[in-house]
């Protein structure tokens, strides 16, 4: 029995129960179509479970190439250009526009955003590319649908080297009839790996494996070869990947319940093996402490050890883990995870929330950082830590008592700058700073001035009013859509203007003959009313 699954956006499609026989007892032979631009099918696109049920992934080319994948530098001349590493530097930017970030209804398409870009953008991946750009990948879910729904997509954003503005979010890929959830990016020399999760497809595909050798312009797509069906897992890659001295590649994934574990590939991303051990928290952040297999796992959520976030040590690359001990940060809950990386200096860096927002649980006694979002640095492989509050953070969009970095991801670029990507805020942020700022007495942003506005193709900027108009065209050259944006806005829950985009004013839609079809009015990123182009009649109830 062979079926091909497609999805109409806005309609919940039933997830196929892969790995079981059809109703008539025959083996399944199913196809999932992956809609993307400049993706090439790799050598491994089909899997069979032990019973013989097959699922095949097919790449289908989009009718357009996202701007994120166009005009990308392929030299590394700008990769090490940046602020001085000797002087404290700390800046905050909006990483996402409003819309689509957490508007009450799906309003992104009304201002010109790409298909598949929805209001919920979460569990993000971040990486500093060889050319100096920053690349972020989120999974995106429409209003009112669950994260495990088949309507989810993977969405990409790029901030180009030397620019203070992120490109507008665009579709990376959409698995029609399958779930796209939880992203991980890993820079491996000149190659960028992307590992994308997705629930409910088959135990033979707990994640997808993509790689790019041209800074994210094009990608090769594969599904993993597992040595046995995945078990005791949740199909969600977390935020860390690394290689060992023998070249084995490891990625972190959620286990079932409040645990995490490592997958290992010994053939450069083709075949994968569950290392077997489990940490004591979901969304754990794991880094090597040496080249002999000693790993440190910190966090991430839904568990505690004596009132603190659990911490585990492995001495065999994650095959086993020592019993959890109380960690150095407070326990976390829903919509929270920490992230830890090793810096170029050799120090460890850790970023986390302090307050458990959904359950309204304050940090444990002994925590000295209040309810702030914090970063911590360890000079001795995690034995001791120094913490500092992160200024300019925002609360979660629906829980506004205290600031949050959400599902945070941290990377360091070749120029030595540290980049933090936050989620669940209104909107998500990028925080950029250096170690000089961390060790200084500075406790705030170091400047409120930015490079000249450079918003990309189709944007006309009025620098005096800090506004811009984004214009898109039909293939015949006629104007298709134009929307107006505040490009130096103060977010709803913030206290200062940031580089970013919030819709402010009209968004006009035209037909292919150039006639105005409809005008939508936005204020602070939210739709206020709509006027029909020909009649001038306003819609009610917006």
Residue map of PLM features:
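Sec-dependent signal peptide recognition
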Residues: 2-9
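Asp-box/BNR beta-propeller blade signature and adjacent active/binding-site loops
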Residues: 48, 55-455, 465-466
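Bacterial Sec-dependent signal peptides at the C-terminal "C-region" and cleavage site
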Residues: 12-26
């Amino acid at each position: 029995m062979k079926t091909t699954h497609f999805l109409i956006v806005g309609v919940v499609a039933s997830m196929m129960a892969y790995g079981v026989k059809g109703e008539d007892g025959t083996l399944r032979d199913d196809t999932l179509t992956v809609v993307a631009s400049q993706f090439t099918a790799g050598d491994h696109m089909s899997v069979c479970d032990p019973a013989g049920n097959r699922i095949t992934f097919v790449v289908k080319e989009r009718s357009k190439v996202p701007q994120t994948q166009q005009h990308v530098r392929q030299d590394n001349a700008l990769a090490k250009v940046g602020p001085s590493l000797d002087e404290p530097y700390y800046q905050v930017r909006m990483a996402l526009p409003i819309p689509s970030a957490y508007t009450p209804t799906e309003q992104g398409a009304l201002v010109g955003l790409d298909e598949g870009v929805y209001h919920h953008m979460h569990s993000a991946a971040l990486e500093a590319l060889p050319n100096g750009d920053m690349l972020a990948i989120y999974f995106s879910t429409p209003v009112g649908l669950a994260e495990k729904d088949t309507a989810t997509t993977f969405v990409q954003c790029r901030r180009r080297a030397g620019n203070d503005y992120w490109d507008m979010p665009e579709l990376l890929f959409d698995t029609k009839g399958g779930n796209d959830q939880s992203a991980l990016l890993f820079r491996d020399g000149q190659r960028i790996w992307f590992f994308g999760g997705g629930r409910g497809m088959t135990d033979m595909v707990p994640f997808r494996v993509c790689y790019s050798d041209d800074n994210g312009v094009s990608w090769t797509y594969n599904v993993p070869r597992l040595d046995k069906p995945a078990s005791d897992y949740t199909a969600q890659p977390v935020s860390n990947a690394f290689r060992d001295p023998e070249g084995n590649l490891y990625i972190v994934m959620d286990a079932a319940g409040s645990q995490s574990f490592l997958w290992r590939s010994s053939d450069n991303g083709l075949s994968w093996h569950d290392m077997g051990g489990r940490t004591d928290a979901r969304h754990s952040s794991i880094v090597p402490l040496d080249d002999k297999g000693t790993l440190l796992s910190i966090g991430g959520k839904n568990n505690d050890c004596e009132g603190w976030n659990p911490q585990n040590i492995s001495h065999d690359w994650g095959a086993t883990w020592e019993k959890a001990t109380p960690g150095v940060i407070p326990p976390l809950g829903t919509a929270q995870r920490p992230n830890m990386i090793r810096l170029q200096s050799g120090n460890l860096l850790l970023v986390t929330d302090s307050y458990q927002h959904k359950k309204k649980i304050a940090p444990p006694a002994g925590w000295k950082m209040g309810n702030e979002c914090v970063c911590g640095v360890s000079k001795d492989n995690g034995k001791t830590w120094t913490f500092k509050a992160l200024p300019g953070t925002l609360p979660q969009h629906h829980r506004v008592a205290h600031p949050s970095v959400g599902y945070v991801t941290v990377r360091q670029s070749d120029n030595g700058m540290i980049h933090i990507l936050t989620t669940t805020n209104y909107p998500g942020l990028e925080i950029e700073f250096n170690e000089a700022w961390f060790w200084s007495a500075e406790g705030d942003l170091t400047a409120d001035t930015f490079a000249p506005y450079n918003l990309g193709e189709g944007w006309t900027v009025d620098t005096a009013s800090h506004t811009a108009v984004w214009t898109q065209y039909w293939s015949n050259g006629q104007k298709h859509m134009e929307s107006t944006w505040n490009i130096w806005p103060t977010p709803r829950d913030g206290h200062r203007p940031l580089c970013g985009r919030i819709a402010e004013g009209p968004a006009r839609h035209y037909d292919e003959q150039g006639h105005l079809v409809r005008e939508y009015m936005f204020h602070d990123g939210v739709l206020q009313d709509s006027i029909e182009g020909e009649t001038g009649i306003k819609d009610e109830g917006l």
